[in-house]
Swiss-Prot record:
It is found in: Cell membrane. Keywords: Amino-acid transport, ATP-binding, Cell membrane, Membrane, Nucleotide-binding, Translocase, Transport. GO terms for cellular component: plasma membrane. It comes from Corynebacterium glutamicum (strain ATCC 13032 / DSM 20300 / JCM 1318 / BCRC 11384 / CCUG 27702 / LMG 3730 / NBRC 12168 / NCIMB 10025 / NRRL B-2784 / 534). Disruption phenotype: Deletion of argTUV in an L-arginine producer strain results in a faster and 24% higher L-arginine production in comparison to the parental strain. The gene is argV. It catalyses: a polar amino acid(out) + ATP + H2O = a polar amino acid(in) + ADP + phosphate + H(+); L-arginine(out) + ATP + H2O = L-arginine(in) + ADP + phosphate + H(+). This is Arginine transport ATP-binding protein ArgV. Belongs to the ABC transporter superfamily. One of its GO terms (molecular function) is ATP binding. Residues 6-250 form the ABC transporter domain. Pfam families: ABC_tran. Part of the ABC transporter complex ArgTUV involved in L-arginine import. May also transport L-citrulline. Probably responsible for energy coupling to the transport system. It is a peripheral membrane protein. ATP binds at G38, P39, S40, G41, S42, G43, K44, S45.
Length: 254
């Protein structure tokens, strides 16, 4: 059984002639947190979206928990799997976007129980009980019957995290989860993410929050221009980077 939750091997992605990912190798062990950092346009979010086949890779292989994502291999040839099979793979991978993506016409608890009931076929009573547990964990049990428009951005993002966790994923992907928030609301979301990490959730996080990366990440990967420039522990990459490109990026944040 693989000890790697994510194993990306020479992953390439292009849009026409534009190469966005140029042979990415990335390994994320189970139960660890990896933060992807780098300038805008470096390919971080594209890489994240390839992990659950929201973007299709053009070359290379990407495995999650030992399963080839998006394709089936036969006699050395890759065949794209059906959207139904891709959705099944995706149901084991939680994803939290920048902009919350909550259903505006459903209450907080309705947002959380929707997928467990319809995708995982859970009884509504079980889904509701679990949703309330998760809302308690993210500090929003008192908002169960509120609508998204009645919540702050930070509260909406905490609901979005609870909604993703309700599907009992083996992996969580975060695409700049705090970038759309007012600065004073960032901390409440990062605290929820840190709690997830402390609970052993495997996480791949695209972020500009260097303090979070330093405190929570097991591995930091610096990307630029579609390649991995440098990877290692937070101390190695953030405190003592070897590559000039990494040093330039980090100094630009100060």
């Amino acid at each position: 059984m693989s000890q790697l939750m994510i194993d990306a091997q020479q992953v390439c992605k292009n849009y026409g002639r534009l190469e966005v990912l140029k042979g990415i190798d990335l390994q994320v062990p189970k139960g660890t947190v990896t933060c992807l950092i780098g300038p805008s346009g470096s390919g971080k979010s594209t890489m994240l979206r390839c992990v659950n086949h929201l973007e299709k890779v053009n070359a290379g292989r990407l495995y999650v928990d030992g399963d080839l994502i998006g394709y089936r291999e036969r006699d050395g040839v890759l065949y794209e799997i059906s959207e139904k099979d891709a959705a099944k793979q995706r149901s084991d991978i939680g994803m939290v976007f920048q902009n919350f993506n909550l259903f505006p016409h459903r209450t907080v608890i309705e947002n959380i129980i929707e997928a467990p009931i319809h995708v995982k076929k859970q009884p509504e009573s079980k889904a509701r009980a679990r949703a309330m547990e998760l809302l308690e964990q993210v500090g929003l049990a008192h908002k169960a019957d509120a609508y998204p428009v009645q919540l702050s951005g930070g509260q909406q993002q905490r609901v979005a995290i609870a909604r993703a966790v309700a599907m009992e994923p083996k992996l969580m992907l975060f695409d700049e989860p705090t970038s759309a928030l007012d600065p004073e609301l960032v901390g409440e979301v990062l605290r929820v993410m840190k709690q997830l990490a402390d609970d052993g959730m495997t996480m791949l996080v695209v972020t500009h929050e260097m303090g979070f990366a330093h405190e929570v990440a097991d591995q930091v990967v610096f990307m630029a221009d579609g390649v991995v420039v440098e990877a290692g522990t937070p101390e190695q990459v953030l405190d003592n980077p070897k590559e000039q490109r990494t040093k330039d990026f980090l100094s630009s944040l100060l």
